[in-house]
Design a protein with these regions (language model features):
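Positively charged n-region of N-terminal signal peptides that target proteins for export
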Residues: 1-4
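Composition-driven detection of intrinsically disordered, low-complexity segments
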Residues: 7-8, 191
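Bacterial N-terminal signal peptides
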Residues: 8-16
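Active-site region of chymotrypsin-like
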Residues: 26-41, 100-106, 132-196
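Conserved active-site neighborhood of the chymotrypsin/trypsin-like protease fold
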Residues: 39-45, 52-124, 128-132
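Beta-propeller and closely related beta-sheet repeat lectin domains
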Residues: 46-49, 167-169
Length: 196
């Protein structure tokens, strides 16, 4: 009987912890969008980070540059698509600004300070299967990496990144934006997971 009671209490405790954690992170999912782009016969997936309440979204340049038919949807309404327009593409960084006509919540604080070993979180649209939460640490501070024949100043993390995660927010435990997931490279059998 004691075993059953202990298991029941443990189950209730785990459900409570899960619900608290889930509701705590839900607000960050509301500030992140899924991106899909039809290119010829291929469908490209990516992620976007909302940075203003009037529909401005930041993502990676390599995702949207020279692309048409950029569609946006939210995790809680996957059947509703918004067409995005490219506002600006950075010539120096792997960043692009796009816009949709929708009022929404957004990441309103950016934190430029971080440290080696710091716990961080990310949200990504892995392979177009919808948004998911990743957790990890900063494993290397500023590092120049060659990606697509360009030298990119990046931060290395051990968060898993899949196709479709580019442009997703990386944030700290306070919910302040630190950067975007940008690329994954294989180097000497190990992955370098970059954040711009």
């Amino acid at each position: 009987m004691k075993k059953i009671s202990a298991c029941f209490i443990l189950s209730i405790f785990l459900m409570f912890i899960t619900s608290c954690t889930g509701s705590g992170f839900k607000k960050y999912f509301e500030k992140t969008v899924e991106i899909s782009i039809q290119e010829d016969k291929n469908l490209i997936y990516a992620t976007g980070t909302i940075i203003s309440n009037d529909g401005l979204i930041i993502t990676n340049k390599h995702v949207v540059e020279n692309k048409n038919n950029i569609l946006i949807n939210y995790y809680d309404s996957p059947d509703i698509k918004y067409e995005a327009n490219i506002i600006n593409v950075s010539s120096n960084y792997d960043l692009a600004l796009i816009k949709i006509d929708k009022k929404t919540s957004f990441f309103n604080k950016i934190d430029e300070e971080f440290s080696l070993g710091q716990k961080i979180y990310s949200i990504g649209n892995a392979k177009g299967y919808g948004l998911f939460l990743g957790e990890g640490i900063i494993t290397s501070e500023y590092k120049n990496v060659i990606y697509n024949k360009e030298e990119i100043l990046s931060i290395q993390t051990n968060i898993e990144i899949y196709d479709g995660c580019s442009g997703g927010p990386v944030f700290n435990k306070k919910g302040n934006l630190l950067g975007l997931m940008a690329f994954r490279l294989r180097d000497d059998g190990k992955y370098i997971l970059g954040m711009s």
